[in-house]
Amino acid sequence: MVKWVYMNEILFAEIYYICVAIMLILGFKTYRSMMKNSQKASFLAVVFVHILYFQTDLVRMSNVQNLFLNEMSFLFFSLCTFSWFNYILTMLEIQYVKKTQTLIALIPLIVSVVLLLMNPLNGILFKIDQNANFQEGPFYLLYVFINDLYYLVGAYKAYVYSCRAKNYQQKKSYQILGIYMAVMMIVGTLQDIFRQVPIFCVGTSLSILIVYISLEEQMISIDPLTQLNNRNRMEQHLFECMRNADANMYLLVLDVNRFKKINDEHGHAQGDLALKA
């Protein structure tokens, strides 16, 4: 039994540190990227907070009876949800000018912190019994719900803005963000049910990686083989042309029949040369 517990701790540590490595790589790539400073700062904040959460939760899982570590794990989880909500607002270019708007956005985080401060006194969120078992308090579900609000509102805003998107590329980017927020809400709920399994750690790392790659692909406008404008660039150019209603626009489409036959008979190298020509 002792050996099994020891192996579990090693396995969990490996999972967490792999997720931390993924976050560090994404953070480094983002820091070196050409994205807007506001988007870069908000994404780096997401990466940093998640690394803190992963490290804290790993230590907590090996010291389940420690109330302070459990409190810190809950706190960083709340910061994770808020940091992603802030990133969604940044990507959607939503700016809160009034202080009241900022305060409203901070209410779920403030309530979470207040509940965590009160928890050691009366166990309203959770408590650890004598057998080191985690027991939910009367306000535990409230804590889960108010943190899920960031995911719900973020997904809703991404959906609304995708419907108002100016072009297909922007619409797709907003849809990716909205789907991610919905997935993260499901992953977070599963983590609340299975607290001793690193579901949130793995789920959020893979989701962030997929979102990062998907958004980077949306930014690529040059075909790597031909060095010509690709579909993304064509959509951007068509959108700019259609905005000018006074100008005439003509679209010439060239369809090459049996182009694949070149690859089949002469190989992919010759097919690439023909495509470039």
Regions found by a protein language model. Give the residues of each.
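Extracellular-loop-to-transmembrane junctions of the mid-late helices
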Residues: V5-C19, M118-G154, Q191, V197
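Hydrophobic alpha-helical transmembrane segments of multi-pass membrane proteins
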Residues: A13-M34, S38-N63, L69-N86, A105-G123, ...
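Alpha-helical transmembrane segments in multipass membrane proteins, preferentially the mid-helix core
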Residues: I25-G27, S83-Y87, N147-K166
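Membrane-interface helix-boundary motifs at transmembrane edges
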Residues: T30-F43, L89-Q101, S162-S173
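Non-cytosolic membrane-interface motifs at loop->transmembrane helix junctions
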Residues: Q65-F74, N131-P138, I199-G203
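Signal-transducing coiled-coil linker helices
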Residues: Y161-L225, N232-C241, N248
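Hydrophobic/aromatic micro-motifs used in signal-transmission helices and low-complexity FG repeats
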Residues: L225-T226, V256-R258, H266
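Conserved long alpha-helical elements within nucleotide-processing catalytic cores of c-di-GMP signaling
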Residues: R231-Y250, K260-A277
